Regions:
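N-terminal targeting signals for export/organelle localization
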Residues: 1-48
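Long amphipathic N-terminal alpha/beta scaffold segment
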Residues: 31-72
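Short active-site neighborhood of thiol/selenol oxidoreductases, capturing the structured segment around
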Residues: 64-93
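Structural microenvironment flanking redox-active thiols in thiol-disulfide oxidoreductases
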Residues: 89-140
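Thiol/selenol-based redox catalytic cores and closely related redox-interacting motifs
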Residues: 134-169
Length: 169
């Protein structure tokens, strides 16, 4: 099954099970994100990627410039291990890793999670590629893709739903 099919199936099943106010908040957040213009501001194919130096899940640091010195890099940004959609994407990336490696590229995932949460995500999903922590979303902002979805949804639902970004502490 393709990643799109998995995501669509999950969303249909999930939306059928949640209360209407959660569905409404999620739909509203999706519409706000689409209307925000983020897609127009994000880096495009062929744009120069800004360098970064981020901590990985095992206590090291990874610099994009160093990765690029050895070949192409597939870079995936995700919201965090708390996001079921993101976990489906990470699983699909893990399945694609042998082909990515065969083509001479490296795969790296980036999220606003703390390194401890990134380690948990790595272990839970049995990932064999680097998972980096972009606390404060500095790198995501440099790529033009940062947004505040979790806090907005939590405010809409009047419930604290921690995102494990290190910012709620």
């Amino acid at each position: 099954m393709s990643l799109k099919a998995e995501l669509d199936a999950f969303r249909s099943e999930f939306m059928a099970q949640v209360p209407p106010e959660i569905r409404e908040a999620m739909v509203r957040a999706d519409m706000e994100l689409a209307a925000s213009g983020i897609a127009r501001r994000a880096l495009k194919a062929g744009d120069r990627a800004p360098d970064f130096n981020l901590p990985d899940a095992r206590g090291g640091h990874v610099r994009l410039k160093d990765l690029l010195a050895t070949g192409p890099v597939v870079l995936s940004f995700y919201r965090g291990g708390w996001c079921p959609y993101c976990n489906l994407e990470l699983h699909a990336l893990q399945q694609a890793l042998p082909e990515i490696t065969r083509l001479g590229a490296k795969l790296v995932a980036v999220s606003p999670q703390t390194p401890d949460e990134s380690l948990s995500t790595t272990e839970k999903n049995a990932l064999s590629f680097s998972v980096l922590s972009d606390i404060g979303s500095t790198t995501a902002k440099a790529f033009g893709i940062a947004y505040e979805s979790c806090r907005r949804i939590a405010a809409d639902l009047r419930a604290l739903r921690p995102c494990f970004t290190g910012e709620e502490r």
